């Protein structure tokens, strides 16, 4: 299950990365510039690049179609000539205004007051596009028509071929802009899901690591079951392998099942906080019966050969004997062996003696006088 969660987290991370990259790429590909589609009297079309203003109304989604009229005066810093009266009610007119001499908001406001539905402001001696803005709040509240900015070369082409006088018309195509919630909400949902999955993965891994560490450590009740020996001169142990200090009379030594002894103050923290193995031979400290099932995994891991595996592990007899029991068991074994030999000798002697004993069989024959006649037949 943990492996599947890890694979899930890996997939979620990859999906999160891919979607993030694609989202930013999509946002970068979103056009920030609108277009002007111009048609002449022969219905030949040409596209010009423009930049919408930061004030006024937005262009309608289907675009704004109208006839292009040159502003008079060209800078539109004062009231300009309105569109033709005869076509004012039936058609939409867009005015072309030159930059400079006054603020952009003044130019667009004069175009609106003259009756135009949109305004196109062009640059002078440059084809750079400028984002038109305004700092006058009072004027901004009065502007209702959309406006765009174009370069000088685009303005010259529009004047030459696509004006109302030459039978042309233009269409102001709005920029492709999506509402913020269209891409922000899905992005936040994806980020939230990824964060939740990451938190679940981290919690699962924390619980798993904690369980593994607890399983590989010795509990205090298990530690109390290990024998403690007070050191006396003449004991076979002389130096603690952890602190490298010589044992002194009265020192409390913790005897492990592998017969290695250490200071209690040195080995107890190792067993309860690090790992329940002997620091020298890496043999596992035998747990209680209740922990045999829970320690199966850890015992399998420790049985694997690694760089910490001792070259000469203690024998099976050493694992089950405590400190000071080796000599006693050896002497007891020798005594039992001698007893067994004496018994074997006695049995052998008795068997030989039995073989030498002659078996006697008694044959009884009846005599004519009725008295039995006993003949002894010796058989070997």
UniProtKB/Swiss-Prot annotation:
GO terms for biological process: organelle localization; positive regulation of JNK cascade; protein autoubiquitination; ubiquitin-dependent protein catabolic process. Keywords: Endoplasmic reticulum, Endosome, Glycoprotein, Lysosome, Membrane, Metal-binding, Nucleus, Signal, Transferase, Transmembrane, Transmembrane helix, Ubl conjugation, Ubl conjugation pathway, Zinc, Zinc-finger. Residues 35-182 are lumenal. Residues 1-34 form the signal peptide. Autoubiquitinated. Glycans are attached at residue 88. It comes from the Eukaryota. It is found in: Endoplasmic reticulum membrane; Late endosome membrane; Lysosome membrane; Nucleus inner membrane. Residues 285-380 are annotated as: Disordered. It is a single-pass type I membrane protein. Residues 64-160 form the PA domain. SUPFAM superfamilies: PA domain (SSF52025), RING/U-box (SSF57850). A zinc finger (RING-type) spans 240-282. Residues 338-356 have a biased composition (Acidic residues). It holds the Pfam family PA. The RING-type zinc finger domain is required for E3 ligase activity and for promoting ER stress-induced JNK activation and apoptosis. Interacts with ERN1. This is E3 ubiquitin-protein ligase RNF13. The gene is Rnf13.
